[in-house]
Amino acid sequence: MAKSHLPPWLLLLLLPTLCGPGTAVWATSPLACAQGPEFWCQSLEQALQCKALGHCLQEVWGHVGADDLCQECQDIVNILTKMTKEAIFQDTIRKFLEHECDVLPLKLLVPQCHHVLDVYFPLTITYFQSQINAKAICQHLGLCQPGSPEPPLDPLPDKLVLPTLLGALPAKPGPHTQDLSAQRFPIPLPLCWLCRTLLKRIQAMIPKGVLAMAVAQVCHVVPLVVGGICQCLAERYTVILLEVLLGHVLPQLVCGLVLRCSSVDSIGQVPPTLEALPGEWLPQDPECRLCMSVTTQARNISEQTRPQAVYHACLSSQLDKQECEQFVELHTPQLLSLLSRGWDARAICQALGACVATLSPLQCIQSPHF
């Protein structure tokens, strides 16, 4: 099989997905999936949500044998797994995280940040590598037929859990942990905050638009017809997938496993402003920009408090209050409905007509280029 030229960053982004179906971030109602292939194959997201990717690739987007799809999927996962073992992959991430430790605003946190990296970074990488199961991943995507149940993930090794935290954690962990040593620091040391902050910095620095083209290179390993469809889908959806995986799954998985942090991210956090979005996500159209800002803030809040969060978003100094309130009054019901299905901000704003939509998978299939 041809060698992949994907950048090593890609594996970091896919690790949460590769660690098993328990980390799935999308949620589509059973009633929606019950509509059948007409609903499943409208988009890559819906095919994944309804676990019908294999059906759509075989019957709607192209014609290829089930065994071929299963084998190609496992080959791709194995390529990505090998990439995590490359020194350049680990060194690049390690150097970036060390720099982030150095520039922490509170200098008292710098030594402890470096200590956490020295001790737990190699252990975490090794643990994730050992948990990747190509067949289970491809079964979860619907590209391999279900067989015998796969063995569950190994429990987190004791050496991966901060031992000094175990005795101090409450019965129900909160979103913040306490000081490792009250004698060394005059204020509580928020390790969970530190963990999430470092991961968000990684998210912000990754050029998602550039990666979209790089991800499509992996499509050369699949059959010709499906390969063309794969390339179109990869270029269209990579940014969406990266935003979801990095923004939601990775912080919860890594920080939850290593630091036993709560998975409830909304407690004590300020909704991100428009400036927190990666550069390529800042639209020029005012209505699209407004929609992206409101939707992004609402996505990072628990479902119960989203209606209030949508209205509070208009208080942002970056938005025109009157235009924002008009937009919210008009679109809130549909916006909340799409948020509950797990849609990302750009897809929602395209569905609402606020942002210009690019090619859909069905348009890709009809393209004369393949």
UniProtKB/Swiss-Prot annotation:
Q: Where in the cell is it found?
A: Secreted, Extracellular space, Surface film
The Saposin A-type domain covers: 26-66
Q: Name one GO cellular component term.
A: extracellular region
Entry-listed glycosylation sites: N300
- Record-linked InterPro entries: SAP_A (IPR003119), SapB_1 (IPR007856), SapB_2 (IPR008138), Saposin-like (IPR011001), SaposinB_dom (IPR008139), Sphingo_Act-Surfact_Prot (IPR051428)
Q: Which Gene3D superfamilies does the entry link to?
A: Saposin-like
In its miscellaneous comment, the UniProt entry states: Pulmonary surfactant consists of 90% lipid and 10% protein. There are 4 surfactant-associated proteins: 2 collagenous, carbohydrate-binding glycoproteins (SP-A and SP-D) and 2 small hydrophobic proteins (SP-B and SP-C).
The name on file for this protein is Pulmonary surfactant-associated protein B
Which species is this record about? Oryctolagus cuniculus
Lineage from the top down?
A: Eukaryota, Metazoa, Chordata, Craniata, Vertebrata
**What is the primary gene name for this protein?**
SFTPB
